[in-house]
Amino acid sequence: MLFRSYAKTEPERVKKALEYFTKALIGYVKACKKIGVDGFYTPTQGGEIKFYEVPGFFETFVKPYDIRVMQECNTQTQFNILHICDYEGKYDDLTRFVSYPGQIINAPCEVADQPFSLQACEQLFKRPAMGGLYRKGAILKGSSDEIAKEIYELKKTLKGKRFILGADCTILPQTPMDNIRTAIKTSHHTCNIE
């Protein structure tokens, strides 16, 4: 809320602060690559519906800075995941992220209050998608059978296409480890089933 307020009233000061953050992140990325990191999980936020109250918010205060950091992440690395984070709010459209770098896309399970499938993600971004599990769904509060069913159903809807199983965002800290183990075990088992 405070960030949006300052973006309206003090846009030049906000841009100056973002410039400092961007330079620091680029320095961090370079240091990581220097010690051997060969890929990054690059998250973005700021395109959520709640930011529409500030005209041009995404184009002015998010994308230019994101792109600079993500381009550095994608220079001389082999594998990078673009994560479109909906932890702070919903999206009504993801097309503004299509030009973002990253070999794999991890997007929300819901866009414009509608399910957003891995197939839809691959079709929009023309790159492989990672996800399929809603972080607040079966992985968080379901039984082993419910988790397994969700993964088997996902595989069935993909009709033999390869996919990278994951959550739509960071799984919550209270997610039971047994549920995570069930998801891993089930995903390994589904690899051997046509």
Model regions and ranges:
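Active-site loop segments of alpha/beta catalytic cores
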Residues: 1-194
